[in-house]
Amino acid sequence: MKKILFITFGLLMTATIVFAQQNRVTSILEILDVTTGKRSVVKEFPFQIESPNWTPDGKWFIYNSRGRLYKISAENPGEPVEINTGFATSCNNDHVLSVDGKQIAISHGTREDGQSRIYTLPIDGGNPTLITAMGPSYLHGWSPDLKYLAYCANRKGNYDIYAIPATGGVEIRLTEAEGLDDGPEYSPDGKYIWFNSVRSGLMQAWRMKADGTEQTQMTFDEDLNSWFPHVSPDGKSVVYIAYNKDEVKPGDHPANKNVVLRLMPAEGGKPKTIAQLFGGQGTLNVNTWAPDSKRFAFVSYRLESNN
């Protein structure tokens, strides 16, 4: 989920200009091989990009930047190609691909009220179809049978996990815990939904059955707030991002922080840190695993002074 703070246009422009005058952001699209621990740079961008999806055929990364979606070759990265999303030009970093590689689901801030809603469209671009009538809704998962989307939504003042038919319909509330539940993602066999929740006091990774039953805590990181668990395509591993609890509140996932990427067995067990980097928001919001389950993509950042 990417929370959006609505302030006056003048204040927003002032804040943006001040930040731009002081710093410029370099985004580094990287790959990490979990078998060797090796990190490799795919491409650097002199502006902010977020949340790369690795396409099921292994050929492309799809990411968001400045409200639009782009794709870039995973094998021979050259110039990015913009994906036509029609009227949806305020896409945030919550976008996922169908497992058959034919569709993409996006979260777009609608012009009428600025709230994020979920849409689907062909993966090569096209006119988006509205799925969630209510907002805010932040997409994170698509079931492997293609029948349901899972998302985080604020309804009546609380953020919980919901599912909805992928063609639209009545949404189904899956969690009712006090506080933030976020980042729902289906396991490759469709039996479980992984998500993160503050219900234990810190943000931790949880797992439940796809119908919302048997909600079980999966990480117990005493010094970390752990976000966005992503299951590998073979169903064996989970990677997630974590913040130091002394630097970031449990319900926050800001940009431009020192963070770690952690790896754990999908059936539970002790996680291990596999990378340290400067990032946070936009680094690993959505599933970024390669089809071979040996690598995943992420974005790290570098702030450089304009002075």
Regions inferred by a protein language model and the residue ranges of each:
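Sequence signature of WD/YWTD-type beta-propeller architectures
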Residues: 21-307
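Bacterial Sec-dependent N-terminal signal peptides
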Residues: 1-22
